[in-house]
């Protein structure tokens, strides 16, 4: 492809806590599953897809609660480092999105290849644009920006179809199970379980 063989993904999953009261389950570890299984499962899935990995080793996993000491089950920061049979992955998750940001989180995905890289700014581009769906590409031939806001996203339509018709057009069940298996194992490792 345009960036060669994918070597690594870096995925961020920032979210906003907000200045409003949340239900009790939001702070109960047994109810929400932990920051890695709750938020990080998406980034783990992306890592597996873009590195074309069908197995992975967990090198590092960490979760912390630094802002809500009165809610000991809450986790506001997490990080994960993975090595798959197709590449490497780093994931950062947090509940630190500042109130001034126009969206709930500045989610990004960086895909590094051996001939270039792609950066996707999913929900905002900070001071440049309040809308999302920005893609930046840099390789040996070009440096390019693409506004992807009008690109059709068939994944969720296909996922609904998969559930109804027991098909695997959005993604395979095997990939879904592997993503969640890794998310749960990583969460447990981070919590020293």
Language-model segments: which ranges?
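Predominantly a Rossmann-like dinucleotide-binding segment in NAD(P)-dependent oxidoreductases
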Residues: 1-72
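Short, hydrophobic secondary-structure boundary micro-motifs
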Residues: 6, 59, 121, 170-172, ...
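A generic structural signal for residues located within well-ordered alpha-helices
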Residues: 39-42, 151, 171-174, 178
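Contiguous beta-strand/loop segments that form the cofactor/metal-binding neighborhood of enzyme cores
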Residues: 45-125, 156-166
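Short acidic, glycine-rich loop/turn motifs
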Residues: 82-86, 136-141
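Short polybasic amphipathic segments
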Residues: 109, 125-140
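Active-site loop of classical SDR/Rossmann-like NAD(P)-dependent oxidoreductases
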Residues: 146-157
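C-terminal helix-rich "cap/oligomerization" subdomain common to oxidoreductases
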Residues: 158-193
């Amino acid at each position: 492809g345009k960036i060669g063989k994918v070597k690594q993904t870096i995925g961020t999953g920032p979210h906003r806590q907000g200045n409003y009261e949340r239900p009790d389950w939001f702070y109960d570890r047994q109810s929400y599953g932990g920051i890695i299984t709750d938020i990080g499962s998406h980034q783990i899935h992306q890592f597996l897809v873009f590195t074309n990995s069908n197995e992975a080793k967990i090198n590092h996993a960490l979760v912390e609660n630094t802002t809500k000491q009165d809610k000991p089950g809450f986790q506001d920061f997490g990080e994960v480092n993975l090595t798959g049979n197709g590449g490497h992955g780093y994931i950062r998750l947090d509940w630190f999105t500042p109130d001034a940001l126009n969206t709930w989180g500045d989610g990004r995905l960086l895909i590094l290849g051996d001939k270039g890289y792609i950066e996707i700014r999913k929900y905002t581009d900070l001071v440049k644009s309040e809308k999302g769906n920005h893609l930046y590409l840099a390789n040996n031939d070009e440096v390019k920006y693409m506004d992807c806001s009008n690109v059709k996203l068939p994944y969720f339509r296909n996922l609904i179809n998969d559930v109804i018709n027991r098909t695997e057009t959005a993604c395979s069940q095997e990939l879904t199970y592997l993503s969640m298996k890794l998310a749960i194992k990583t969460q447990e490792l981070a919590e020293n379980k």
